[in-house]
Amino acid sequence: SELIKILLARPYKLKQGFLDFWIPTYFYIKKQEYSLYGANGAYIPNVNMEFFELLQKHPGDYSVKALDVSGVRMDIFNQYRKFLNVRALGSVTNDDFVETIKPFFFFYSHQLNTYAKHTRKFNHEQTARFRDTLAVAKDPEKTFFEDLPEALGFCKETLCDKDKVEEFCYVINRAVRELRSCYNDLIDRIEASVLDALGIEVYEYSEYVKIIRDRFSSVNEHLLTDRLKEFYHHVLTEFDNRKEWYQSICYTALEQPLERLRDDQEEKLVHNLISMFRECEKYSDISRMNACGNDGEECF
């Protein structure tokens, strides 16, 4: 709207009808040279007909900023592209910028589950800062050239050193790896606690799950509470992979999907799991004793 006011006033004194045609046309022609932002400051990656219609109706809702990728920013930008395994560039258009940043937002939005978006159980604090910066990003240019380097401990002056720029890329690689593995790391910790509590020294899922099922196969379900019966059914259900089995048994102990677990709930979850396994062991012993008694045999 400020641009329109300037063009309507002296010395330009352009007509509103002309501006309604010229401004969208100019923006379309120059769309590779600027970044566009909406009313709430959110970045708009694609310019389409719907945008032009809204621009004519509500010009004050939008702002533009020239895309500045030069000097140190170009080095940082090409490190992002190196991470994505795409070729380095000597100059950057808006399409190049969108192509480069889009995978990072897709990774956060679509490849991280709820647990990964909230946990802080990482080997490196930079991992949580990397994720949290993506989570609140509105201005991608500021996010990728200012906020992320700062969050990961790299100031503007430091990044003038090309070795530091490469180190910055390494930290991002490491953060992505830790984010991808954190949910499996959670299951690893739960698995270790369960096997230790049950005294099982076999660590291959396909093997130890058979031991657990055999141990509890004699339980008389009529002795179990509703909650324990639900847990018992989850324990005995056959799953092809470890992840699904742990998600299943944890659902009863947590009373919500495992991926919604928060860090301060992990200790209680493990405690509840072990308690329910102990209960199942107790009722398994009782059921075997009853079976032996009915057969007139002595049980040990």
Give residue spans per PLM region.
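Charge-enriched amphipathic alpha-helical scaffolds
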Residues: 4-44
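Long low-complexity, intrinsically disordered regions
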Residues: 6, 10, 29, 64-300
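C-terminal engagement modules used by replication, chromatin/transcription, nuclear envelope/ESCRT
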Residues: 35-86
